[in-house]
Regions:
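Non-heme Fe(II)/2-oxoglutarate
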Residues: 326-420, 441
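Conserved alpha-helical positions within TPR/SEL1-like repeat arrays
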Residues: 19, 23, 46-57, 80-91, ...
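Alpha-helical protein-protein interaction scaffolds
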Residues: 219, 225-228, 240-323
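Structural marker of alpha-solenoid helical repeat scaffolds
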Residues: 40, 74, 108, 142, ...
Length: 530
């Protein structure tokens, strides 16, 4: 049998004009010459590669990918070429294909540091934070001083709520290079851990490097607010707005401060400037609380028509309808009292090791107090408790997730938006402990940022003058909303240790004061869609 004839490959002399055109930046000429040569040498790896480089240099990414893939069809073992294809695909927003190319690169050449990094970045952009972290860790193993990989690893660890690990990685990165953004990220992680003083220090380090860093002033203002340093926090919000008058979060944070301190006119101005998060609902709140009912009703109807799943809007709509005797036609959660759920957490009942460990960790954990204007004779933790490193807090978070499934199952037949659009994937927007002493109570409020909220009870007063001392009370009225009558329903629930009470975040709730010289400890949380 006759042997197949191997097609001739171009010589170095023949490809030299293409190389010269590329090296001198004459990309159009290089493209033209390579395209012409491919007619003569259609199976020449080197010519397809040069053609791809000429196209890529002109930002003809789609055609460049096709050219490189033809080269790889001839020789698929060239890791660098798979890497180049990955970069081009990423530029074309073809993320899955880019990830496949980077994975092929590192399988062919495990020591290719930049490929591990790019793979991590592509996975991070898709929200695949655990996989991204693994890729960044491989890049750092190969190059321990890879600053960008360390920074991004810190970010994805923070996204996964691994705050202590993220802080350690940021500290490693800062040993390599002092960077304002890294100090900012670390400050945010420290704040979420409840380490408010350390967060302030990190933010100040960021400002030393970048004195006009508006976001840092705004975030540090929030930390000082949590520490009860209200005048200083306002000064920082204003400093942020000097640096960037349009910064949404600074306008919003200043508005929240004014809102909480009773300056509703000032709050309204800054909410409307911010156009951030739930600014429209909070603007309506300001109008309602100042009895501007006509303006409120007009804005309410406009917002109801376009936003069908807002818990805060449900509070405002429901209260207005009940207050003025009109129909509540907002179907998010028109009857929130029906969705109160009182049950046990089995892991906290009886002689519970978890309960004892939680009480110990609450006593010993390095968590700073968050000032809470509605709380009387008590302290509230700062940060996000379920995101801390202590095993007991994380285990309690898992217990809550199991109860949430029971909660969903219990109300699965209901037809309102609150149930029908209950988040399939969720996160704990916040979680904290509250310790109260004699006379302790929490005034009526809602949780504006949550979908569903709850409280678990770890220690309760037993020496009561009446059965509902220390109980939680839920109602469709509270927070000193304007009231035209006294017919709003209310219900008191007396939990026992190891119980959990869950309810829509849009429902008013408060703690009834207790008189005994005992301690009441609960862990509260807000759940929101991811």
């Amino acid at each position: 049998m006759k042997r197949p004839t191997q097609m001739r490959q171009p010589t170095q002399l023949e490809i030299q004009p293409i190389l010269q055109a590329l090296n001198t930046g004459n990309l159009e000429l290089a493209e033209s010459k390579a395209k012409k040569m491919l007619k003569q040498f259609p199976n020449a790896f080197v010519v397809h590669n040069l053609y791809g480089n000429a196209l890529a240099g002109q930002n003809k990414f789609k055609d460049a990918v096709a050219a490189f893939r033809k080269a790889l069809a001839i020789d698929p073992s060239v890791a660098e070429l798979h890497f180049n294809v990955g970069i081009l695909l990423n530029n074309l927003n073809r993320a899955d294909e880019a990830i496949a190319s980077y994975k092929k690169t590192v399988s062919l050449k495990p020591s290719f540091t930049d490929a591990h990094y790019n793979l991590g970045a592509a996975l991070q952009a898709q929200g695949k934070f655990e996989q991204a972290a693994n890729s960044y860790k491989k890049a750092i193993e190969l190059e321990p001083g890879f600053f960008e990989a360390l920074v991004n690893l810190g970010v994805v660890l923070q996204e996964r709520s691994l705050l202590s690990e993220a802080i350690e990685v940021y500290e490693r990165a800062l040993l390599i290079e002092k960077d304002a953004k890294v100090y900012f990220n670390m400050g945010t992680a420290l704040k979420n851990e409840g380490r408010l003083g350390d967060a302030v220090e990190s933010y100040n380090n960021a400002l030393e490097l970048k004195p006009d860093y508006a976001e840092v002033y705004s975030n540090m203002g929030e930390v000082l607010r949590d520490q009860g340093r209200y005048d200083e926090s306002v000064g920082l919000y204003k400093k942020a707005l000097e640096c960037d008058p349009t910064l949404p979060v600074a306008n919003y944070s200043l508005a929240v401060y004014l809102y909480d301190s009773g300056d509703l006119e000032g709050a309204l101005e800054h909410f409307q400037k911010s156009q951030f998060a739930d600014w429209q609902e909070r603007s309506l709140y300001c109008l309602y609380k100042t009895s501007k009912f006509e303006e409120f009703k007009q804005g309410l109807d406009e917002l109801k028509a376009k936003n069908h799943n807002s818990p805060f809007l449900a509070t405002l709509t429901g209260h207005y309808a009940e207050n003025f005797g009109t129909e509540n036609n907002y179907n998010f959660c028109p009857n929130p009292m029906d969705f109160v759920f009182h049950t046990e957490v089995p892991e906290l009942k009886g002689d519970s090791e978890l309960l004892q460990q939680l009480l110990k960790d609450i006593r010993d954990a390095h968590v700073e107090e968050k000032m809470q204007g509605r709380l009387v004779n008590g302290v509230q933790s700062s940060g996000n408790l379920f995101k801390r490193s202590e095993a007991s807090f994380r285990e309690l978070g898992e217990c809550v997730k199991r109860v949430i499934q029971r909660y969903k199952d219990n109300f699965s037949d209901e037809n309102c938006t609150y149930v029908k659009q209950f988040p399939k994937e969720f996160e704990f927007a916040s979680s904290w402990f509250v310790k109260m002493n004699q006379g302790g109570h929490l005034n009526s409020h809602i949780h504006e940022e949550g979908w569903v909220s709850g409280a678990l009870y770890l220690s309760l007063p037993t020496d009561k003058k009446h059965e509902h001392e220390g109980s939680i009370e839920v109602s469709t009225h509270g927070d000193d909303y304007p009231k035209k009558h006294d017919n709003f329903p209310a219900k008191a629930i007396a939990p026992t240790i190891g119980d959990i009470v869950m309810f829509p975040s849009c429902l008013f709730h408060r703690t009834i004061p207790f008189t005994s010289d005992e301690e009441r400890i609960c862990v509260a949380f807000d759940l929101k869609p991811m």
